[in-house]
Amino acid sequence: MVPSFLSLSFSSLGLWASGLILVLGFLKLIHLLLRRQTLAKAMDKFPGPPTHWLFGHALEIQETGSLDKVVSWAHQFPYAHPLWFGQFIGFLNIYEPDYAKAVYSRGDPKAPDVYDFFLQWIGRGLLVLEGPKWLQHRKLLTPGFHYDVLKPYVAVFTESTRIMLDKWEEKAREGKSFDIFCDVGHMALNTLMKCTFGRGDTGLGHRDSSYYLAVSDLTLLMQQRLVSFQYHNDFIYWLTPHGRRFLRACQVAHDHTDQVIRERKAALQDEKVRKKIQNRRHLDFLDILLGARDEDDIKLSDADLRAEVDTFMFEGHDTTTSGISWFLYCMALYPEHQHRCREEVREILGDQDFFQWDDLGKMTYLTMCIKESFRLYPPVPQVYRQLSKPVTFVDGRSLPAGSLISMHIYALHRNSAVWPDPEVFDSLRFSTENASKRHPFAFMPFSAGPRNCIGQQFAMSEMKVVTAMCLLRFEFSLDPSRLPIKMPQLVLRSKNGFHLHLKPLGPGSGK
């Protein structure tokens, strides 16, 4: 039997705990209300669409067709308008080149309200770092994306793509349309495994396969968390099955990366192994990071190495998958452009069996079509920043430091004040002459300014090799009954996949 004084003590503790929770909850509410007041006051000069009393604009921007709704708002509210995710997170949503230049030519940090969700997986890598630490990492990583490093990757892109195309050859024999998205995703992730760790389909052990599945899982789970407001609170999220699944996948990914780093560092202590690695046809991303030193001869810590490897895997997987899938959809939708691209790459390939690095620079028309597909379907439709200092825009309106900015790339790319007939697929927009006349911040598929995508040359090189090989092997056409439905998440996906008809071309079309 529990003594009465202990019962009273437990009761008192319970009351104290309940009281403390109520006080903390009240203080949190006060903090949120003050933050809303600050954000709302900062944006009071910017009219915008009406908000829901509880959800702000969240319900509208999660609906099918929400991207085009934002485009319609852009017509109604030139330059920018407030965009509220619930009642406490408000961004100034911008979609005009001069407004974009005012913010993205600087180097303000990513908005923590969005990007802090990524920390559990990718840590503090280049995507979320700021200040001197970001600058140090940017300088250390830049040599890893130099042309001389990228050149040997053409063979890696070719190898992974050929595996995918052989699968498509079998599927195409059935004479029915099929969804290409998962196969493209598998190919893109397989390519990254080879370029990051020197692994691939020919050498995936159990540990590598588990990592491969974990990265796929983490990407999907992160997408789902971003659009599910009940998951935005960390404490609540980690208690849910969704959150626990995310943590398990994180552990698998981190264990794999840590072990590969340990093994590679140990191997590099052996001079023979080190020379063998240095003489390979290409250095993988991990080798480059391990050899990176700044001007003070300081190298990346193990935690930094893991963060940058995980960031590279995250940023380079879904974006590439999205870009390739939407491009092939555009080719199916516009067969005249598909035909012209195919003829160009056939002429470039000639009697060769494979594309060489120098061939990529000759793919003029294919590159213009890739860029036009990026304009209409940017792989990352929206990015976010937090102002580190005040900004004054071209029309005289301003925002204070601490304000949140949403750069709506999709709406920018369909802004009729910038792009005549924005819904029309016109590859000639990206001819040298036309591109030179355009505002430098009118086209931002890889963001812009000092914090632009460090891997854009890697991505464009992969896009060219993959799409050229696809067009040489198959003729793509639409399935009118299953057209893609745009679904904006962290990357631009299709709600129902990308169902295309593929017609194998004759021998010699793709070597």
Curated annotation (Swiss-Prot):
Induction: P450 can be induced to high levels in liver and other tissues by various foreign compounds, including drugs, pesticides, and carcinogens. Its EC number is 1.14.14.1. Its main location: endoplasmic reticulum. The keyword Chloroplast does not apply. It is a peripheral membrane protein. The keyword Heme applies. SUPFAM superfamilies: Cytochrome P450. It is found in: Endoplasmic reticulum membrane; Microsome membrane. InterPro entries: Cyt_P450 (IPR001128), Cyt_P450_CS (IPR017972), Cyt_P450_E_grp-I (IPR002401), Cyt_P450_sf (IPR036396), Cytochrome_P450_Monoox (IPR050196). Detected in the liver and lung (at protein level). Heme binds at residues 315, 453. One of its GO terms (cellular component) is endoplasmic reticulum membrane. GO terms for molecular function: heme binding; heterocyclic compound binding; iron ion binding; monooxygenase activity; oxidoreductase activity, acting on paired donors, with incorporation or reduction of molecular oxygen, reduced flavin or flavoprotein as one donor, and incorporation of one atom of oxygen; oxygen binding. PROSITE patterns: CYTOCHROME_P450. It comes from the Eukaryota. Cytochromes P450 are a group of heme-thiolate monooxygenases. In liver microsomes, this enzyme is involved in an NADPH-dependent electron transport pathway. It oxidizes a variety of structurally unrelated compounds, including steroids, fatty acids, and xenobiotics. This is Cytochrome P450 4B1.
